[in-house]
């Protein structure tokens, strides 16, 4: 059910060093690195932890860099959950779409309390 959890950080290099060392104890390793985010885990098919500089580059705090992602079996399933969340009172924080070509499709909402959620499909 959980795809990945994102934690906002202020120093990505320091966070990568810390989590690489810590998560190695559980068989974790760096799986994907991009300019402002790094994903750790055992494989892309299992739950992951990501650390990132918040998208708006403001200071990280709960709700600004933190997000829970729910992996789905298809792009259509991710989009359906996005629309269900909107119908239940969530607000759009990123319309459904391919974010990384042939690798990641995501749809983002904020729940009624402002918590950021993602419904995604890897592929």
Report each predicted region and the residues it spans.
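Short amphipathic alpha-helices in soluble, non-transmembrane regions
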Residues: 20-22, 81-86
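Short beta-strand micro-motifs in enzyme catalytic cores
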Residues: 38, 66, 103-107
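N-terminal beta-strand motif that seeds the catalytic metal site of vicinal oxygen chelate
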Residues: 1-16, 68, 123
């Amino acid at each position: 059910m959980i795809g990945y959890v994102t934690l906002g950080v202020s120093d990505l290099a320091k966070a990568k060093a810390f989590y690489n060392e810590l998560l190695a104890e559980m068989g974790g390793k760096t799986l994907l690195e991009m300019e402002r985010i790094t994903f750790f885990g055992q494989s892309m098919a299992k739950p992951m932890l990501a650390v990132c500089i918040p998208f708006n580059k403001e200071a990280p705090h709960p709700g600004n860099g933190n997000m829970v992602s729910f992996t789905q079996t298809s792009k259509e399933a991710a989009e359906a959950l996005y629309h269900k969340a909107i119908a239940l009172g969530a607000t759009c924080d990123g319309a459904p779409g391919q974010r990384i070509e042939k690798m990641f499709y995501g749809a983002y909402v904020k729940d009624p309390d402002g918590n950021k959620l993602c419904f995604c499909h890897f592929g």
